[in-house]
């Protein structure tokens, strides 16, 4: 948008290879992938269209929709993993989690609901000026999402995980 508005823009690459978040790296022994590609689901269609990103080479071979776990994988140090090809629903992933903990398998659905509620709070602001904390608080005051926002703003990620799950 800066260049579109006539400003001079310089892009610098910190790494020894070009590609930034789209570069492929080994994130766990035997598992390679683009380390930040999972953020692409946040790329809004309006931005893609405004900047004509497809005309400049943007290609996305798939999107992840809620409940689609076929492209998600959770590797463990011993080489085993959960998710991945063949796991196409939250229920199938919960069944894999159940092998480790029935309580965590049930908690997985609460975890999904927490993040869906979080998304519903933030999504209206994706293409606007960021809201103030007061505006966010006002937007959920008196609703079931009030506690979700409080946790989003004041809890660490590890606190959220430990609140939901009994195992790593």
Model-derived features with residue positions:
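Residues within well-ordered alpha helices
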Residues: 1, 46-54, 96, 160
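Glycine-rich FAD pyrophosphate-binding loop
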Residues: 3-28
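Residues at alpha-helix termini
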Residues: 4, 28, 49-50, 99, ...
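N-terminal FAD cofactor-binding segment of flavoenzymes
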Residues: 25-70
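Structural motif
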Residues: 28, 76-77
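Short polybasic amphipathic segments
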Residues: 70-76
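Rossmann-like flavin
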Residues: 77-168
């Amino acid at each position: 948008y800066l260049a579109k508005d006539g400003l001079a823009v310089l892009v610098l690459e910190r790494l020894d290879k070009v590609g930034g978040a789209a570069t492929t790296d080994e994130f766990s022994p035997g598992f390679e992938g683009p380390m930040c590609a999972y953020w692409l689901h946040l790329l809004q269609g309006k931005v893609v269209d405004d900047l004509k990103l497809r005309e400049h080479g943007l290609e996305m071979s798939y999107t992840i929709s809620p409940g689609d776990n076929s492209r998600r994988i959770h590797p463990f140090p011993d080489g085993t993993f959960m998710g991945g090809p063949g796991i196409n629903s939250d229920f199938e992933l919960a069944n894999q989690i159940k092998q480790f903990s029935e309580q965590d398998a049930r908690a997985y659905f609460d975890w999904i609901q927490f993040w869906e509620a979080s998304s519903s709070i933030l999504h209206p602001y994706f293409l606007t000026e960021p809201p103030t904390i007061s505006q966010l608080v006002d937007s959920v005051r008196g609703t079931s999402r009030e506690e979700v926002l409080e946790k989003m703003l004041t809890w660490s990620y590890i606190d959220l995980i430990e609140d939901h799950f009994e195992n790593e």
